[in-house]
């Protein structure tokens, strides 16, 4: 399976509360990136600068579901694998804009006009975008630029999420990889044989 790690509503990799000085089962201070501090999407129900639902209030770390954040799910999977030999949480990642305005790939902060199309045209709605962001992008390693090849790459989980930069990266992980693998002519075949494709 693939997880949408970031989109215009928020990111779900991890959460860190700078005021509390701690995170949700993590100590990474960079986990403040594009966060929705509620445990639902009610905070995105802001219309003309006013919150329409009381459920949109921020949720304290101790009340926030730890598996709302993907890093915690991955850690749980590794622990389960260590104890039982099975990891049910082998996930791939994608990012998306989740746009409703027919502008795929428009993830640039400087040009962000919103994601709702006609409703974004009015000047009063600009204040509503303080609760969201331009979103992310999905990067998929595919043998060719065709729908079938892209979906095959997604099935292999050779995909990753980015918040706007567009690097071209293909990488593998594993304990049996040769440190000099990048110098080999068949480094991709070696990656598949000795490791796991990571994007």
Predicted features along the sequence, with ranges:
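C-terminal functional module detector
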Residues: 2-199
């Amino acid at each position: 399976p693939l997880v949408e790690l970031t989109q215009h509503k928020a990111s779900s990799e991890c959460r860190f509360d700078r005021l509390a000085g701690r995170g949700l089962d993590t100590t990474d201070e960079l986990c403040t990136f594009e966060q929705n501090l509620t445990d639902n999407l009610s905070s995105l129900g802001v219309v003309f600068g006013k919150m329409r639902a009381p459920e949109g209030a921020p949720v304290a770390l101790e009340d926030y579901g730890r598996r709302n954040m993907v890093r915690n799910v991955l850690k749980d999977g590794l622990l389960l694998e260590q104890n039982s030999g099975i990891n049910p949480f082998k996930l791939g990642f994608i990012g998306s804009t989740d746009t409703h305005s027919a502008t795929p790939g428009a993830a640039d902060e400087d040009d962000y006009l919103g994601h709702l199309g006609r409703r974004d045209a009015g000047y009063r709605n600009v204040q509503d975008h303080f609760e969201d962001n331009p979103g992310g992008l999905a990067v998929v390693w595919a043998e060719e630029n065709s729908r079938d090849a892209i979906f095959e790459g997604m099935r292999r989980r050779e995909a990753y999420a980015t918040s706007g930069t567009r690097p071209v990266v293909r990488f593998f992980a594993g304990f049996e990889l040769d440190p000099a693998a990048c110098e080999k002519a068949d480094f991709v075949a070696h990656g598949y044989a000795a490791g796991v494709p990571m994007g």
